[in-house]
Amino acid sequence: TLYNDLKLFLSKNNVDIVVFSENVYYGYKNHYIAERTRQLIKKIEQDKLFTKHPLLLSFYGYEYINNVVAVYWSQQDMILRQKEILIPFFEKGVFGEEYSLISDRLNQPKSKNKHGYFTMNNIRINARICYDALFPSISKTYPGLTIIQSDYSWLNNGSAYKNTILNGSILSKFSVNIHSPLINIQNYGGTIVISDDWKINWDVYNKSLYMPFIVIEI
């Protein structure tokens, strides 16, 4: 299973945080993935994985919330953040309709997230979900690192897809903080890392195209 593979990977690699991309594999949108998600959470709790490695998970629907939800889970905190920027017709309705959890549409959050940041090893981390990163934060305290959980796969137009991911990552860095590193984690490979001095880590990008787990050094 993915969890067992992840445990094996973590036993061989020293990491500070485990981050999942935005995905539809885990969540509560239907009974099948809900059961898979419950099993994942149960195993994490049994192994107390969150005490060894803080986790930034992503769920397609979370418990009663009909939206994409990022969950930061550490020994000290469990912080939820909903996806704020939903695309009309594709992810949400046009007129603010409310949909049930099992719908193929999501619900627009009624208010902005209170928690967009968390601190790990004295580093203030800005966690964003996909297109949320394209819109500037009103916070006056800049993050030391931005992590974006993304799934651009529906924009995959063949040979130009690489540029789509790259341009989205660059625009996000302009938006969130031009002076700190940014990691844009893609669900089907193509993870982009941009350093504080704007260098692209193409080694990480290439590895992410075929490796299920990768270590990113900042």
Model-derived features: positions:
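Soluble catalytic regions of membrane-associated enzymes that act on cell-envelope
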Residues: 1-87, 120-122, 139
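CN hydrolase (nitrilase-like) catalytic-core segments centered on the catalytic cysteine
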Residues: 17, 23-25, 32-56, 123-216
